[in-house]
Amino acid sequence: VVSETEELTGLLKEPKRNEYARVDRVAAWFLLARVYLNAETWGGKNEYTNAYKYAKKVIAEGNYPLASDYRHIFLADNNTCSEIIWPLVQDADYAQSSAGTNFLIKALMNGPMDNYVKTGVGSRGWGNARVKVAFVDKFDEADQIFYADDTWGDNKKDKRAQFFTIDHTKETWVEGKAFQKTFENGYACIKWRNVTKERKELVEGGTKYSSVDFPMFRTADAYLMAAEAILRGAVGGTQDEALGYVNEIRDRAYMSGKYGDGASGRITAGELSLDFLLDERAREMHMELVRRTDLIR
């Protein structure tokens, strides 16, 4: 995998020169960063310097800059999102499936929720998946609650805390009590919405299938991989650099700094650790197919 991907970095098209959803050499750099970051865990060889090298290349080349709003990455018009390096295309008309982002929307959605928040699938949700308490608690308590007059979380500090909580319990199950299989046990995650950045449905009442492309590779992950590689000893990186990468991600999440006038979510050098990064990856990358790998690493 590594040798072929390294060869492809010189064969694939220049950044942004390929047609949409086809990989270019930035995708190859990203894949190498991810493989090298996990090399010690799966192969017993420390490759953190190479992980840092390729993650930084993704960032420094600047071809896929961070989106200005975290929430825009997971919407029906995310084909215009600057951050997505390699998307898996979904289309309500031409790529209909119960899998992909159609599942990610409907599995967390149920009929009564449509009275409060538009996810672009109408009342077609299945209500068969909920998030665990351990994940919800990675966000500040004030950011965990859904308010009917703020369905996009504009008034939250961390805009990544996208939960639906009305008439739902936080716990999916309480020890010592009988397990009840209902969609009100546990909060729903409304990160994925089949609507546009203008917060409009593609058609009135929503579509049967999703048009939200799945971001298989995106730049924010490169920021977090670079930071982690540095903390794990990558040669050439500095602690200040790692802190800068993490705070850039948090600035965007909090819509602060160059992203807006929200309350700052920045951390100090003393707060940055591998444990913090693991939690930050959960906050940033949840439901994007990386958590199991992160936990094993």
Feature locations, PLM:
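Acidic, mature catalytic/reactive cores of soluble proteins
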Residues: 161, 236, 294-297
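Structured loops at beta-to-helix junctions and adjacent beta-edge loops in soluble globular domains
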Residues: 88-91, 108, 122, 126, ...
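Short, cationic low-complexity segments
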Residues: 105-131
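Active-site-proximal region of nucleotide-activated glycan assembly enzymes
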Residues: 227
